[in-house]
């Protein structure tokens, strides 16, 4: 049995294959996932697992150098936005690097998901609970 934090074989596999600047999406239950994207569906029911639970596990395993978030989260889900910023601040301290935060429109965000190595769908049912993680290097 794998000793690391990620037990899901699909998530573990995609993270291990990421190269520098490759992207990985963690999304809510409602984000449309392009047919061309590898879909890893973790959703069990509404809210399970939560966006932050999935993101926490993924970022424990993945080196992150930048993130892309929909601008709309600031207005339509400010509590999650603050939680997300706190998580990214803690991740920066843990990794020892600065994580660039980029904002884009939700429409542009959806288009960019097609370029990601995979889209991990959570059970989150709150608006704009989506993030694109850009892989960094550990050296």
Swiss-Prot record:
Name assigned to this protein: D-ribose pyranase
Species: Escherichia coli O81 (strain ED1a)
MF terms in GO: D-ribose pyranase activity; intramolecular lyase activity; monosaccharide binding
InterPro entries: D-ribose_pyranase, RbsD-like_sf, RbsD_FucU
EC number assigned by the record: 5.4.99.62
Active site: 20
Cellular localization per UniProt: Cytoplasm
Quaternary context: Homodecamer.
Reaction equations catalysed: beta-D-ribopyranose = beta-D-ribofuranose
Family: Belongs to the RbsD / FucU family. RbsD subfamily.
Residues given in the record as substrate binding sites: 28, 106, 128-130
């Amino acid at each position: 049995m794998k000793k690391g934090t990620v037990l899901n074989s699909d998530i573990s596999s995609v993270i291990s294959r990421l190269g520098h600047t490759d992207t990985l999406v963690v999304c809510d239950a409602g984000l449309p996932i392009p047919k061309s994207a590898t879909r890893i569906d973790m959703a069990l029911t509404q809210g399970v697992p939560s966006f932050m639970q999935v993101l926490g596990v993924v970022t424990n395993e993945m080196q992150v150098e930048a993130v892309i978030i929909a601008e709309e989260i600031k207005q339509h889900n400010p509590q999650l936005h603050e939680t997300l910023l706190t998580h990214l601040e803690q991740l920066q301290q843990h990794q020892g690097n600065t994580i660039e935060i980029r904002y884009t429109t939700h429409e542009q965000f959806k288009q960019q998901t097609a370029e990601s190595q995979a889209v991990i769908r959570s059970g989150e049912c709150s608006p704009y609970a989506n993030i694109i993680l850009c892989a960094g290097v550990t050296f």
